């Protein structure tokens, strides 16, 4: 499908990036099209059998000194630790704290599942908001201990609703009881959690990355076939400045 699309993208960065990757990674000068797709496929697969096209081979060839992956705090970091102990890997590989599901209270079923995973990985029994915050902080500490200095966040719009702790506690309990939070409650809970995390990041002198305007899972068909983050996202067109300004201002209080 991509080979049929790429000839129509001349002038778009995707056209140039595609051919730069073919050239730089595989030494292939042929322009990608339906007529050349099979030939390029065969050439690229032959190259992938060579050591310099392995994961470590490519990192060495492009002189990558540091590589940061994006990682859900409810998942393990055992592979990062194994890589750190492998003297043959010259590239430093660190996790990046990506807690996108930490405020997903509008979908109680998925939120409960995620909290259960966080509970297991953090070894903290989560029965209320205080436990939840402690578990998030413990994962920040763990990421920091193995070299992480980055967090990464994606929002359709930045959170800019600032509830009391009591309100956040009630929203957490509502979702934990299997009841979906409404959009206003979800925005309030997201603001509360994000502000809490920002304070943790600041205390450890981390860099926080924010991606605004990502419109997720546009295609139900793709979502049902492959799940989230499988190519069904696009750029949103919601206003960003006012809410981002309000959030950054709140951080300074």
Model features per residue range: what roles?
Residues 180-253:
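Long, well-ordered mid-to-C-terminal structural blocks that present hydrophobic/aromatic surfaces
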Residues 1-204, 253:
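Metal-cofactor-binding active-site regions of metalloenzymes
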């Amino acid at each position: 499908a991509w080979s049929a699309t790429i000839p129509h993208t001349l002038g778009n960065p995707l056209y140039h990036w595609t051919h730069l990757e073919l050239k730089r990674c595989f030494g292939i000068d042929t322009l990608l099209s339906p007529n050349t797709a099979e030939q390029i496929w065969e050439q690229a697969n032959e190259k992938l059998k060579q050591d310099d096209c392995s994961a470590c081979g490519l990192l060495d060839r492009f002189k990558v000194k540091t590589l940061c992956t994006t990682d859900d705090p409810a998942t393990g970091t055992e592979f990062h630790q194994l890589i750190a102990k492998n003297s043959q890997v010259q590239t430093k590989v660190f996790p990046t704290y990506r807690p996108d599901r930490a405020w997903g209270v509008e979908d109680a079923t998925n939120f409960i599942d995620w909290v259960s995973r966080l509970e297991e990985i953090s070894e903290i029994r989560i029965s209320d908001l205080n436990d939840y915050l402690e578990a998030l902080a413990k994962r920040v500490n763990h990421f920091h201990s193995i070299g992480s200095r980055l967090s990464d966040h994606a929002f359709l719009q930045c959170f800019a609703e600032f509830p009391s702790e009591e309100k956040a506690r009630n929203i957490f309990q509502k979702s934990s009881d299997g009841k979906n939070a409404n959009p206003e409650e979800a925005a309030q809970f997201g603001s509360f959690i994000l502000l809490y995390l920002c304070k943790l990041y600041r205390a450890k002198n981390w860099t926080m990355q924010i991606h605004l305007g990502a419109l997720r899972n546009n295609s139900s068909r793709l979502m049902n076939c492959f799940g989230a983050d499988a190519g069904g996202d696009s750029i949103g067109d919601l206003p960003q400045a006012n809410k981002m300004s309000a959030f950054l201002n709140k951080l300074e209080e």
